[in-house]
């Protein structure tokens, strides 16, 4: 496997992207993840009533769904498959422009035209919204393979529930008196849409009991069979089977307008629901067999563990006692040598690849690239300016210290000259320093015997 070292330039731009985005991105970009398809979502989509809409070029359509539901586009077609004289004739301006066309060409263009991205485009505009307005023209669909042909839009959509309620029904224990049956019911004009049903342990129902092991058992098929798309349903607490010994029913459902359900859903004739229930029954049988087998194996294991093994007199017993060891023993086992890793040297291919990535980043993210460059230049300018200021301060401090030392030395020199001239070299250094420290002194300098006039000097520092 060829590896290379990422260049510092690419690392700088990655850092800039992280700073400008304000969040750390994952190292794997655009990775595909496998998501299991939830069968209940397919059942819910098949349960929806299909609302069909048709409009010609230049018209406007509005899609809307009841409260607590959202639009789910099922089909979408924009183009033409029938002649213009049968559906959505061309407008006056377009009809006049087509007057000079070949009749055979007009028949061809007026009969076949299909904008393949129509379904995707309508889904982008209207999915997961409660209300949506679409203008039927070629500008809405961003591509028109047949501009001389008058087209129309045909689509279908359903209203799927967007939020569900959760409720836990505490089932009685075997020692408790029997309680009334569980009843799920919607008000008039609404029906049940069940999303999930489980039997599981719940601290809400057993506040005084410590739950050591959480247990969850799926009972969605049993609840769907009795409650889906119904105005109400009754569930018997002892009729719902699960593997949890002390489980309670936890249902995720919602009551929505009756108008969103299809006739097949109301009658309980959904193909996807029947297939799901059959598969669930088969899996339930396998789970039951596996569960009871595990229980039997566990019982046999407990029986074997509880029973004491027979003692064989011929088998020597070794006591777990180390008192007979008279000295410490050390043993060094041979270990495998550590794996040798080859040193990865930078190569031109890796650097070139990094530079290409930087160029590609510039093309796709111009604003972020400019912001990264501005940020890098600003940081560099701040660092240089700080270095200049620190250098200037250090040099000024050195100059001031030098000037102070020079002034002190100059003053000491002048003082020594004055004192030496006064004493004429006859005074000792001890007397000189004493007079300088006193700062005020009076000295008489006695000359030679020939000198008639006495000379004295007085200095007051």
Swiss-Prot record:
Transmembrane segment boundaries: 370-390
Comp. bias (Polar residues): 415-429
Subcellular location field: Cell membrane
Leader sequence segment: 1-22
Protein family (similarity comment): Belongs to the EVA1 family.
Membrane topology: Single-pass membrane protein
Residue ranges of domain SUEL-type lectin in the record: 55-160
GO annotation, cellular component aspect: cell junction; M band; plasma membrane; striated muscle dense body
Its job: Acts as a receptor for slt-1. Required for the guidance of the AVM pioneer axon to the ventral nerve cord. Acts as a unc-40 coreceptor to enhance the sensitivity of unc-40 to the madd-4 midline guidance cue to guide muscle arm extensions (muscle arms) and AVM mechanosensory axons towards the dorsoventral midline.
Family matches, as Pfam families: SUEL_Lectin
Region annotation (Disordered) ranges: 397-429
PANTHER family: PROTEIN EVA-1
InterPro entries cross-referenced by the UniProt entry: Lectin_gal-bd_dom, Lectin_gal-bd_sf
Key words of the record: Cell membrane, Membrane, Signal, Transmembrane, Transmembrane helix
An annotated Gene Ontology molecular function: carbohydrate binding
Protein name: Protein eva-1
């Amino acid at each position: 496997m060829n590896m290379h070292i990422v260049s510092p330039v690419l690392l700088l731009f990655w850092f800039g992207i992280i700073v400008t985005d304000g969040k750390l991105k994952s190292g794997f970009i655009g990775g595909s993840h496998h998501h299991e398809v939830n069968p209940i979502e397919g059942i819910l989509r098949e349960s929806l009533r299909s609302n069909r809409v048709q409009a010609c070029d230049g018209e406007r359509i509005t899609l809307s769904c009841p409260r607590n539901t959202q639009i789910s586009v099922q089909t979408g077609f924009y183009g033409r498959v029938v002649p213009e004289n049968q559906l959505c004739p061309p407008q006056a301006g377009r009809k006049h422009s087509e007057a000079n066309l070949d009749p055979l060409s007009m028949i061809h263009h007026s009969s076949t035209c299909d904008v393949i991205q129509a379904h995707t485009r309508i889904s982008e505009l209207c999915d997961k919204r409660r209300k949506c307005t679409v203008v039927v023209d070629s500008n809405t669909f961003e591509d028109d393979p047949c501009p001389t042909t008058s087209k129309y839009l045909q689509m279908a959509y359903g209203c799927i529930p967007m939020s569900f309620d959760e409720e836990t029904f505490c089932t009685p224990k075997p020692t408790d008196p029997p309680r009334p049956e569980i009843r799920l019911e919607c008000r008039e004009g609404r029906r049940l849409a069940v999303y999930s049903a489980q039997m599981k342990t719940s601290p809400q129902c057993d506040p005084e009991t410590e739950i050591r092991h959480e247990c969850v058992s799926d009972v969605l098929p049993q609840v769907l069979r009795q409650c889906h798309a119904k105005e109400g349903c009754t569930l018997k607490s002892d009729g719902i089977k699960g593997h949890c010994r002390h489980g309670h029913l936890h249902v995720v459902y919602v009551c929505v307008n009756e108008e969103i359900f299809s006739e097949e859903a109301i009658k309980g004739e959904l193909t996807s629901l029947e297939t799901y229930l059959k598969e669930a029954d088969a899996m339930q049988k396998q789970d039951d067999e596996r569960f009871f087998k595990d229980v039997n194996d566990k019982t046999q294991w407990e029986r074997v563990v509880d029973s004491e093994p027979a003692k064989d007199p011929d088998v020597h017993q070794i006591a777990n006692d180390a008192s007979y060891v008279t000295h410490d023993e050390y043993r060094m086992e041979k270990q495998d040598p550590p794996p040798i890793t080859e040193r990865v040297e930078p190569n031109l291919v890796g650097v070139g690849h990094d530079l290409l990535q930087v160029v590609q980043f510039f093309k796709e993210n111009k604003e972020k690239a400019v912001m990264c460059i501005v940020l890098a230049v600003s940081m560099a300018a701040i660092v240089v300016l700080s270095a200049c200021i620190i250098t200037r301060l250090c040099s000024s401090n050195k100059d001031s210290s030098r000037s102070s030392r020079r002034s002190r030395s100059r003053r000491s020199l002048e003082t020594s000259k004055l004192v030496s001239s006064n004493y004429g070299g006859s005074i000792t250094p001890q007397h000189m320093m004493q007079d300088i420290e006193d700062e005020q002194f009076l000295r008489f300098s006695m000359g030679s015997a020939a000198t008639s006039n006495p000379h004295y000097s007085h200095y007051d520092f």
